[in-house]
Amino acid sequence: MTLSEDTLRAVEATAGLIAAQGIEFTRAFYERMLTKNEELKNIFNLAHQRTLRQPKALLDSLVAYALNIRRINELYELKGKGLPVPPEHWAELQGFFSAAERVANKHTSFGIQPAQYQIVGAHLLATIEDRITKDKDILAEWAKAYQFLADLFIKREEEIYAATEGCKGGWRQTRTFRVEEKTRVNEIICKFRLVPAEEGAGVVEHRPGQYLAIFVRSPEHFQHQQIRQYSIISAPNSAYYEIAVHRDEKGTVSRYLHDYVSTGDLLEVAPPYGDFFLRYLEADEQAPADTQASQEFQMLQSGAINFAAEKTMPIVLISGGIGQTPLLSMLRFLAQKEGKETARPIFWIHAAHNSRVRAFKEEVDAIRETALPSLRVVTFLSEVRATDREGEDYDFAGRINLDRISELTKLEADNANPHYFFVGPTGFMTAVEEQLKTKSVPNSRIHFEMFGPFKASH
């Protein structure tokens, strides 16, 4: 299915009006939908509604779709005719499809189903009618444009569902897990080891950097089901997952997991998902989700670096606060996969508020000493305490500044082409990205994920 010129013009003509209303438009949409379809409160993070993070994410997505709709339509017209899509056309749409891939992974972790797209579409059109235009012809064209986008997501999400379910140890929707271990890492972080409730059952191996969605149902604590994603910190294996949960005093689920969930308790868990991961495929091995992907999403991986084939390419892991969790899975994986024999320079650069809340220091130091001698660990502390020792508890005082790490500067000067993976709070992420851009690091070597509703991963 492709779109007519009438549809393209209608969307392009009204997209600016939606953008001009800003989050007031998407906030009105969510208020309408969650009032009339209360069951969706079991899916949406209501805290993100209050902070307007979700309305802002939807606004960005709608505007991005409207701005790209003509080029997207041209792509599908070429595909429908069996004609090749020029490389420059793919390049122009890489940002859109990268964002779509991240959203599709989020949706599958929530267990989104095709019927729910019809609910969203009905309320989106009603909001356009209430706030943008009552022109029936324009509304009819927007309905076609929305269905076009919905079909794209429904198809991709089914590909992801099927690929994950088809893996050894895989499943669809949720599965019951038991908390095998709960460990307090420090005053604000707890670690949970999760195993299938069925004795002896295995799990699908995640890709280092992916996350689990935890479905929390506790009527005495929450009026509605709560769903949260937590990065997996364990290396890929077929027996268990480990997650680390940062206690947010303003949060609901993190406090619940810290205070009320204990060893032996049961949790409902979706399979591992996420498009932010370390791509490491041995010869003749293909990632499950890639085998199922349609052409436009396979193109996202066509130029991706396979670190199994690039044994000396440097990897730089940069984290702020709890952002270290997906990177810890990557580091553990590299320690297992490459170990002492690796010729690859690896950096672990971490920024923490102070040494008291810095997590996993002992483990990272142990990995460096026993498994990855090529690992260079660098710590920035915003707040240095009187008992902290430079060179042991931290390397640099203050906010993260990559220019202070001479080895990184040398790698860039020597054209070693290091790849940077970074995760953390919004301000931290912005600072790191700006510093890398200042060093003229191309997007192809920048990989990031922001915790929250939406920001495209590179």
Curated annotation (Swiss-Prot):
Record-marked site positions (Influences the redox potential of the prosthetic heme and FAD groups): 106, 449
Chain segments annotated as coiled-coil in the UniProt record: none
GO molecular function: heme binding; metal ion binding; nitric oxide dioxygenase NAD(P)H activity; oxygen binding; oxygen carrier activity
Protein EC: 1.14.12.17
Cofactor (UniProt): heme b; FAD
Domain FAD-binding FR-type: 172-279
Record InterPro entries: Cbr1-like_FAD-bd_dom, FAD-bd_FR_type, FNR_nucleotide-bd, Globin, Globin-like_sf, Globin/Proto, OxRdtase_FAD/NAD-bd, Riboflavin_synthase-like_b-brl
Domain Globin stretches: 2-158
Residues holding NADP(+): 321-326
Residues annotated to bind heme b: 107
Residue positions of the active site: 117, 157
Catalysis performed (reactions): 2 nitric oxide + NADPH + 2 O2 = 2 nitrate + NADP(+) + H(+); 2 nitric oxide + NADH + 2 O2 = 2 nitrate + NAD(+) + H(+)
GO biological process: cellular response to chemical stress; response to toxic substance
Induction info: Expressed at very low levels in untreated trophozoites of the parasite. Expression is markedly stimulated in nitrite-supplemented medium. Induction by nitrite is probably mediated by NO, likely generated upon reduction of nitrite. Also induced in cells grown in the presence of the NO-donors 3,3-bis(aminoethyl)-1-hydroxy-2-oxo-1-triazene (DETA-NONOate), and S-nitrosoglutathione (GSNO).
Marked site (Involved in heme-bound ligand stabilization and O-O bond activation) residue numbers: 30
Keyword Cell wall biogenesis/degradation: no
PROSITE patterns noted in UniProt: FAD_FR (PS51384), GLOBIN (PS01033)
Cofactor-binding details, from the entry: Binds 1 heme b group. Binds 1 FAD.
Domain of life: Eukaryota
Keywords annotated in UniProt: Detoxification, FAD, Flavoprotein, Heme, Iron, Metal-binding, NAD, NADP, Oxidoreductase, Oxygen transport, Transport
Assembly and binders: Monomer.
UniProt free text on domains: Consists of two distinct domains; an N-terminal heme-containing oxygen-binding domain and a C-terminal reductase domain with binding sites for FAD and NAD(P)H.
Protein name: Flavohemoprotein
